[in-house]
Amino acid sequence: MRHPDGMHKLALAALIATSTLVIIAGTAWGIRLFTMSRNQTTTPSTNPANYAIGGFPMTGNPAPDFTLTDQFGHSVTLSSLRGHEVVLAFIDARCKTLCPLTAQIMYDAKARLGASAAGRIELVAVNANPAATSIAAVQAWSINHGLLHQWLFLTGTAQQLKSVYHLYNVYDQVTSDGQAVHDPITFIIDTQGRERLYFETLDSNNPSDLSGEELGLVTGMRQWLPQPQ
């Protein structure tokens, strides 16, 4: 039989360990919420289609501007795309798992809006891997996923890319094997260059999840789609 003092010490140790885990988890979640709240409204969207991929409305602040290089070696400045709705995602040029899902959802969502709408929407990806920054890397990834002429996949020096991550509060770290661990975030920027919505891709191959994510993005894109002149 355990001595009462020993049992008391064990219970106290367990309580301390549990409390420590709660504090660590709470701190991590608090940091994540602080990062996510940069331009969100105080009340998350109540639209179920937005919740399909964690989409939330933003306050409409101007999207931070930047200049990078696309898969063809052309310089692209974000603000030069005004007049089009921009769907902006962060894609790892070496990723073979979650990033292809994000890219496929972007492409399919745009296609579902029809040919007339497609001419008023720009799909833009920023390279989320500062360890694979070459134009050849983003071009090869675009070719491998059938997107070479369907979007702009932008890259730059590691310093330039990290600056964009910072501007958009996107967490991004490169692992020892060269893979990037980053927030799978997609932004919708309106024709006047203002941040309107953001979405987060679910790590799931479930067809119903992917369909829901696509529907959420279609709904958001349609909401801010410019009307034809």
Spans of model-derived segments:
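Short loop/turn microsegments at loop-to-beta-strand junctions
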Residues: A63-P64, V86, D183-I185
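Thiol-/selenol-based redox modules, centered on thioredoxin-like
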Residues: S176-Q229
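Structural micro-motif
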Residues: A17, H149-W151, K162, H166-F187
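Short active-site neighborhood of thiol/selenol oxidoreductases, capturing the structured segment around
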Residues: V76-M106, L123
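N-terminal targeting signals for export/organelle localization
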Residues: M1-D65, Q227-Q229
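Structural microenvironment flanking redox-active thiols in thiol-disulfide oxidoreductases
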Residues: L101-V164
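Hydrophobic beta-strand positions
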Residues: T67-L68, I188
